[in-house]
Amino acid sequence: MARYLGPKLKLSRREGTDLFLKSGVRAIDSKCKIEQAPGQHGARKPRLSDYGVQLREKQKVRRIYGVLERQFRNYYKEAARLKGNTGANLLQLLEGRLDNVVYRMGFGATRAEARQMVSHKAIMVNGRVVSIASYQVSPNDVVSIREKAKKQSRVKAALELAEQREKPTWLEVDAAKMEGVFKRIPERTDLSADINEHLIVELYSK
């Protein structure tokens, strides 16, 4: 399955919630009817079955983190293999992706931009260049921007936006040095309450 390259707003409207796929503290302003389905007048949303609700939740989370279907299923398998709550494990694995950490630290305005920075070799982990977006960051790892990328206007713009967002407690960021420390794996309570991971577990448990 190819990565979606169409309008980001369309995806958010399809899920009925802001997926934060566009840059900005709130990517979708009040003029955009996010609860309205895609289309000129917004097609009426059919009442979903239990399976449909579970599928929509999976698609929502997959799109938030920019992960393809096969990757997402593999994350679920790994989450189920680990000790503890499978749903929480899944979200922690997704949060530990390098592209997500770069975004959370404020070095990219969106996860897509952060992913591009990683693939363009603009990001280092513990002083070494890492160009794999799915690389799992470990506690106490230092994530930084390469010297030649620090002057990019998009990085400065992203850091300015990040100042307006709530700062994750599991990260420590030095904006001046353009580096940060992944202090710990986030707890479920640290993450968005708008995600119902139990629906995803139910979907894959069938």
Swiss-Prot record:
Annotated SUPFAM superfamilies: Alpha-L RNA-binding motif
UniProt superkingdom: Bacteria
Disulfide bonds: none
Gene Ontology MF: a single term: rRNA binding
Domain S4 RNA-binding stretches: 96-156
GO cellular component entries: small ribosomal subunit
InterPro entries: Ribosomal_uS4, Ribosomal_uS4_bac-type, Ribosomal_uS4_CS, Ribosomal_uS4_N, S4_RNA-bd, S4_RNA-bd_sf
CDD domains: S4
An example Gene Ontology biological process: ribosomal small subunit biogenesis
Keywords: Ribonucleoprotein, Ribosomal protein, RNA-binding, rRNA-binding
Membrane-spanning ranges: none
Subunit structure: Part of the 30S ribosomal subunit. Contacts protein S5. The interaction surface between S4 and S5 is involved in control of translational fidelity.
Function statement: One of the primary rRNA binding proteins, it binds directly to 16S rRNA where it nucleates assembly of the body of the 30S subunit.
Family: Belongs to the universal ribosomal protein uS4 family.
The protein, known as: Small ribosomal subunit protein uS4
UniProt source species: Pectobacterium atrosepticum (strain SCRI 1043 / ATCC BAA-672) (Erwinia carotovora subsp. atroseptica)
Name of the coding gene: rpsD
